[in-house]
């Protein structure tokens, strides 16, 4: 490449920095939109070679005086929102994509908010430039000029697509529509990329305003609240001409003057805030519907509805009542509230909408007052009713219905004039007599029905099949013992005891000595009538010590005798011991679940027929329990051995044995 071509390439590099900086600073300023004498970026501008676009700071000379031998630092251009002239009464907020407002600063507490940072550089240190192999003599100046024109067009398009351009257009529209424009401006600044960039007194680009971006997982080196764009670099023998930008995702800044109630931005700022403060206990609505309610020109009228239920004490809970011109009066007089929120701490729909714009409420006021009684000793608060409005409307209704009342009276007179149209009174009296007769017949059937119910209950309760099934289910299951039938059905229990029912199962139980019975556990030896324990009628414990009852003769209706050894340390006494007087009240018809206490010997039986009388012992349950608790050990066994002669329940003197 000749020296002439080198000079052309150096001149193109100088124009690259000059045009890039001028294009960014001009498009990003308000002068581009407001000034009629602003530069038009048309085809002629991109084709011609110019030295100066507009007044640029002197720092730009460092890049426009490039001679091909010196090292050029990166050119940095910052686009920022200038807040120096913003009064202290203004607040700055940022709106995200979900219309949530985030506080930025108040007044001019922060002087700037950095929106974008451009990086324009001549890169000759990167590996892509060093590894690039150019064929022939290199890129000609004509081809390089065409590539740079294409780069500038792409840069101009990119500038109009960034979020800061939308903010600039919004500020310009507000300034044109109002006499007093907001004292904020979008400006640019050219910096030397080799020097450190400080953010003291301003909000830098690396600082996120929306805190929700901290929860986003970011795998790149770019912060979550920023985005980055790069333009394809252009190759020269002196290095790669690069342009890149990092910018904020969200630039919808809102400015509100707290001293002016009718500020143009007050409605835009307060509208999302009302949406967020509405109680969540109300019926779910979309974001657009809530915005329409808050705006006066978008108010819609809904049909009011109410539902009543009784949660704890009688009280009505209604759904949202909205004005409706054609709807009738709601008789429930319920207000729109969240049932679990205090009215002073939550904002309901009644407080978010203007009451003066809703004159069509009849008997119901939309407010945030609790209206039903709870179970926490709170008094019932009635909703406020506009009595004067209701009376006025009733008076108007009466005036409008005078003509209808006259027509109705004429119709009634016409009916009274014809006796055949009047109802007969004799027919109604006959119907009353028939009805009273039916009631009397029904009342006469009640005694017979009651007697039939008692007979049926008696037959079911004394049925032996049901009794045996109940006892078998209790003996083989782990459920608690069921209660026996009432004592009224077993007045003659002694006469129903026959000979087979007095036989004892197994001969081994009859020959057991009385001394072996002494070794058994005191509590388990007691009969259930003395408060003892029936192992087969109780549930299993954590440490089972019971053995299964040996059922060798299932066909015989024998008297069950307990032979189960139980741990001597386990005394399981009944809380309410029964006396022997109540034995007849706890017996079924065909079985006698009676177990002999150990102080009485086993009854003597033979294979032949025998008759026995059953006598009531003189020992009571209270005496036996007190005797067991007072006497223990060997002394107690000795006392038992001394009284063996008085232990019989069945006496053999009354038995009539047949002669062989």
Curated annotation (Swiss-Prot):
List, as start-end ranges, the regions of compositional bias called Low complexity.
321-335, 470-479, 504-515
Q: Which GO terms describe its cellular component?
A: Atg1/ULK1 kinase complex; cytosol; PAS complex; phagophore assembly site; vacuole-isolation membrane contact site
Keyword Transport found: yes
Listed InterPro entries: ATG13, Atg13_N, HORMA_dom_sf
Report residue spans for region: Disordered. 315-369, 467-516, 572-597
GO molecular function: any one?
lipid binding
Give the Polar residues compositional bias ranges. Answer: 349-369, 480-498, 574-597
- Write out the annotated subcellular location: Cytoplasm; Preautophagosomal structure
Gene from which this protein is expressed: ATG13
According to UniProt, the name of this protein is Autophagy-related protein 13
**What does the sequence similarity comment in the record state about its family?**
Belongs to the ATG13 family. Fungi subfamily.
Does the keyword field hold Protein transport? yes
The free-text function statement in the UniProt record for this protein reads: Activates the ATG1 kinase in a nutritional condition dependent manner through the TOR pathway, leading to autophagy. Also involved in cytoplasm to vacuole transport (Cvt) and more specifically in Cvt vesicle formation. Seems to play a role in the switching machinery regulating the conversion between the Cvt pathway and autophagy. Finally, ATG13 is also required for glycogen storage during stationary phase.
Its ancestry begins with: Eukaryota, Fungi, Dikarya, Ascomycota, Saccharomycotina
What PANTHER family does the record point to? AUTOPHAGY-RELATED PROTEIN 13, PTHR13430
Q: What keywords sit in the KW lines?
A: Autophagy, Cytoplasm, Protein transport, Transport
- Which Pfam families does the UniProt entry name for this protein? ATG13
Q: Which GO terms describe its biological process?
A: cellular response to nitrogen starvation; Cvt vesicle assembly; mitophagy; piecemeal microautophagy of the nucleus; positive regulation of autophagy; protein localization to phagophore assembly site; protein targeting to vacuole involved in autophagy; regulation of cellular localization
Q: How does it assemble?
A: Interacts with ATG1 to form the ATG1-ATG13 kinase complex.
Q: Which organism is it from?
A: Candida glabrata (strain ATCC 2001 / BCRC 20586 / JCM 3761 / NBRC 0622 / NRRL Y-65 / CBS 138)
User: Which Gene3D superfamilies is this protein grouped with?
Assistant: 6.10.140.1900, HORMA domain
């Amino acid at each position: 490449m000749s020296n002439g071509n080198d000079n052309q390439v150096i001149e193109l590099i100088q124009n690259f920095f000059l045009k890039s900086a001028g294009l960014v600073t001009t498009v990003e300023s308000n002068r581009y939109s407001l000034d009629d004498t602003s530069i038009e970026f048309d085809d002629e501008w991109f084709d011609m070679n110019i030295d100066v676009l507009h007044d640029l700071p002197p720092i730009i000379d460092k890049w426009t005086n490039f001679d091909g031998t010196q090292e050029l630092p990166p050119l940095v251009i910052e686009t920022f929102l200038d807040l120096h002239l913003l009064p202290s009464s203004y607040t700055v907020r940022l709106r995200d994509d979900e219309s949530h407002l985030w506080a930025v600063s108040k007044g001019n507490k922060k002087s700037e908010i950095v929106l974008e940072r451009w990086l324009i550089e001549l890169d000759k240190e990167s590996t892509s430039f060093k590894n690039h192999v150019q064929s022939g003599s290199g890129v000609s100046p004509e081809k390089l000029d065409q590539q740079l024109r294409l780069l500038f067009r792409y840069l101009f398009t990119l500038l109009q697509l960034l979020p800061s351009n939308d903010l600039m257009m919004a500020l310009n529209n507000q300034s044109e529509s109002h006499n007093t424009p907001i004292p904020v401006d979008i400006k640019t600044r050219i910096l030397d990329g080799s020097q450190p960039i400080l953010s003291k007194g301003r909000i830098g680009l690396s600082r996120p305003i929306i805190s929700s971006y901290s929860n986003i997982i970011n795998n790149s080196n770019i912060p979550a609240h920023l985005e980055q764009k790069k333009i394809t670099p252009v190759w020269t023998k002196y290095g790669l001409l690069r342009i890149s930008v990092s910018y904020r995702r969200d630039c919808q800044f809102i400015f509100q003057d707290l001293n002016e109630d009718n500020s143009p931005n007050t409605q835009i700022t307060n509208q999302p805030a009302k949406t967020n403060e509405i109680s969540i206990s109300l019926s779910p609505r979309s974001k657009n519907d809530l915005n329409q309610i808050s705006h006066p020109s978008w108010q819609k009228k809904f049909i009011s509805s109410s539902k009543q239920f009784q949660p704890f004490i009688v009280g009505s809970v209604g759904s949202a009542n909205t004005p409706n011109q054609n709807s009738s009066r709601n008789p429930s007089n319920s207000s729109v509230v969240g049932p679990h929120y205090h009215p002073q701490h939550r904002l309901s729909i009644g407080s978010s909408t203007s009451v003066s714009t809703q004159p069509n409420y009849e008997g119901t006021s939309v407010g945030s007052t609790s209206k039903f009684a709870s179970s926490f000793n709170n008094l019932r608060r009635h909703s406020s009713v506009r009595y004067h409005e209701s009376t006025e409307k009733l008076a108007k209704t009466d005036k409008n219905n005078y003509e209808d009342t006259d027509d109705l009276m004429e119709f009634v007179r016409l009916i009274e004039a014809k006796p055949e149209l009047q109802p007969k009174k004799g027919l109604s009296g006959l119907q009353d007599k028939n009805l009273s007769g039916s009631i009397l017949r029904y009342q006469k059937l009640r005694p017979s029905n009651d007697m039939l119910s008692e007979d049926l209950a008696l037959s079911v309760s004394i049925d032996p099949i049901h009794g045996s099934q109940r006892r078998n289910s209790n003996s083989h299951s782990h459920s608690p013992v069921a209660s026996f039938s009432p004592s009224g059905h077993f007045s003659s229990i002694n006469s129903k005891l026959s000979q087979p029912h007095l036989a004892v199962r197994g001969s081994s139980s009859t020959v057991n000595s009385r001394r072996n019975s002494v070794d058994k556990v005191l509590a388990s030896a007691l009969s259930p009538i003395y408060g003892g324990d029936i192992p087969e009628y109780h549930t299993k414990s954590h440490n089972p010590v019971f053995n299964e009852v040996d059922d060798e003769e299932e066909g015989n209706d024998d008297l069950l005798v307990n032979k189960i050894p139980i741990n001597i340390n386990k005394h399981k006494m009944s809380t309410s011991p029964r006396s022997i007087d109540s034995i007849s009240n706890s017996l079924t018809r065909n079985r006698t679940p009676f177990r002999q206490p150990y102080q009485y010997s086993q009854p003597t039986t033979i294979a032949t027929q025998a008759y026995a009388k059953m006598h009531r012992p003189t020992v009571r349950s209270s005496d036996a329990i007190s005797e067991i608790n007072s006497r223990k050990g060997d002394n107690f066994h000795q006392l038992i051995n001394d009284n063996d002669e008085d232990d019989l329940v069945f006496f053999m003197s009354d038995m009539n044995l047949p002669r062989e």
